[in-house]
Every structure is written in C-alpha cells, then in structure tokens.
Amino acid sequence: MFPAADDYDINIDIEASAVDSLLDVAPSDVSSPAELTFSRNVFIPLTTACRYTCSYCTYYDVPGEATLMSPEAIRDVVETGVDAGCTEALFTFGDKPDDRYTKIHTQLDEWGYDSIIDYLHAACEIALDEGLLPHSNPGDITQAEFRRLREVNSSMGVMLETTADVDAHSGGRRKTPGQRLNTIRAAGREGVPFTTGLLVGIGETWFDRAESLLAIRELHERYGHVQEVIIQNVVPNERSDFDQPSVDTMRRAVAMARAALPEEISVQVPPNLSPTGDLIDCGVDDLGGVSPITDDYINPDYAWPALDELNSIADDAGLPLHERLPVYDRYLPEPVRRGDVTPAADPVD
C-alpha cells in the first residue's frame, strides 16, 4: 500500500508479478515512435507561493517574498503569446499558496477573489478571451475544484513524481503519494484530460518507478483521462545536490514507461532538461510544452530549446515533428481533430 493511501481511500492493487515484468524491460524491448509532437506555450507562474518545501524545487519563494501576478500582467503575457503563435497558456503555482502565505491571501482578497482557485478560473478566462487554451497545474485540488476548473481548461496536470515516501518530500508539510494519487483520481472522475509523470532521481528505487507507472496505468484504465506521462530527470540547482540521473537510467525509465502504458498515452521528456536525442528510440513521442517567449520558471537555469533545435532532434531521429494543442486529439470533438480539419476555402471577391 502506498504511503497515506488509507487517508484518501486509495484502492490500487498492483501485483508483484506486474512489477517484476516491468523491471525486466530494456530499451530494446520497445519501438521508436512514428512522430514527435510538442505544444507551443506561454508559461504563466500565477504565484511562487507553495505550502511545501521540497528539497529539489527552486520554484517556491518563502513567505514574504512570493509574488502573485496581476490580471494586467497575465493579459500582457497572453497577448505576447498570441502574437508569437502560441496555442497554450500554462498556469502553474504551488499547492494551496493562500493557505500558508498571508500576503497572497490578503492580495487575493483585495482583488475580490476568495481563493487561488477563484483567481485561476479568472486567469484562464483571460487566456480564453485572448485566444489561448489554458493548461493548469494547480497542485493537489479537490474533485469539486476540478469540476469548476474544467469549464475553463483544455487540460490539467500534476506530477505523481513517485509512489515512494522519499526524504526529498520532507518538511513541516509533507507531500504524500496518497494525496497525489487522490488528485489524479479526482481529475479522472471529472473527465479532465490529464498530464502526470515521474520525477527520476529523488531517492526512489527502480521498484518505486515501476510501481508508480503501474499506478498511473490503473487510474487511466478506470477513467481514460491520462493523455501523457512525463519522465523527468531531477536536475542540480541552488537548493539541491541531487545527482542528475545517467543517460542509461533515463533510457531504462522511458522504456519502462512506454511498456507499461497504453499506446494512446504519450511518453514525454522535457527537452531542456533531458538528453532527448538519446531517449527517442526508447519510446518518447512528445517533447512537451515549449515556449518561444517565456522561461521555464520551475527550472530557470535550463532554457527552452528553439524550434530549430526541436526540428534538429526530430531530423536526427528520422521523424516528422508536429505541433499539437495542449489537449490531445482524442479528447476533442471529431470536426476539430488535427487530421480531420478541412482547409478554409479561398476568399471570394
């Protein structure tokens, strides 16, 4: 049973034989993809406040220093993204920031919002008004909050990271696997197209990685909502001395993901963090959201690759590169799916 699973009534039964089979998977056991995809986005860090203090994370600021973007600043970034040809507005913030940070709560109240969820809803409406599709990563939220946010989001996400209880999640407020699995389940119950994934190298074992992938698979088999799984390596930063996983470790982890997950779920690696070219033949078929105008605020020391670099990665692998929306085709109405769109007729004078 996963840590804190009983607290959230998580009933996921993973057979030891399934874990053993997955641990036997090697990169040579999986196939290369038919294509590579990516989404062009703007990264909007709604607030840098978070109730957690995970030791590998540089995203959060301590109380008194955390920022909250204004509606005007959000609109400015969104408009710039539209001009740059982006289709996705990626909204991020830490778990329940208005719970721990008095300043953030006070500012939201002054602007007329009862909670960060209310404010996220309004921010997503700004993106929609300007022509971008929101994808929100709001941390652990309730099923009712998913129900409300689905109205204004094309897709959403939260990283499972691991089903293990690792020291990297230590602190006065500890992130638990049961809590994360509950969030992924809540999204499924509300039919929210969802992104999740593993963070490799934070103290978990190979058994934990296999178990985590199988837990994601089981939740997807119940609800059909997982559109992609990210296999992300931890990177060194000012708060962490974790060693970056080796290429061989990442190749094996990606291959295990491809073998564990149904074909319709994409396996993604972040091209600014991972040795992407070395991972494609292990089953990677998506390069995630890449921004031509904003930083990766979660990993600010690692710049996004330019579109030309993505094309080079695809060319070196002998694969076509296609831009996608933040929500995958199978969750869209049939008339607007990528392969089914009829070109507009030429204008008539």
Question: What is each model feature region?
Answer:
Residues 1-25, 130, 210-213, 217-349:
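Auxiliary Fe-S-binding modules of radical SAM enzymes
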Residues 24-39:
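Short, charged low-complexity linear segments at domain edges
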Residues 36-73, 96-97:
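Canonical Radical SAM [4Fe-4S] cluster-binding loop centered on the CxxxCxxC motif
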Residues 37-44, 87-91, 134-136, 156-158, ...:
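Hydrophobic faces of well-ordered beta-strands that scaffold small-molecule active sites
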Residues 40-43, 92-112, 167, 234-242, ...:
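Glycine-rich, proline-tolerant flexible connector loops at the mouths of alpha/beta enzymes
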Residues 42-44, 48, 95-97, 138-142, ...:
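Active-site-proximal loop/turn and secondary-structure-junction residues that shape catalytic pockets
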Residues 53, 85-87, 152, 225-226, ...:
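Short loop/turn motifs at secondary-structure junctions
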Residues 63-221:
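Conserved Radical SAM active-site core
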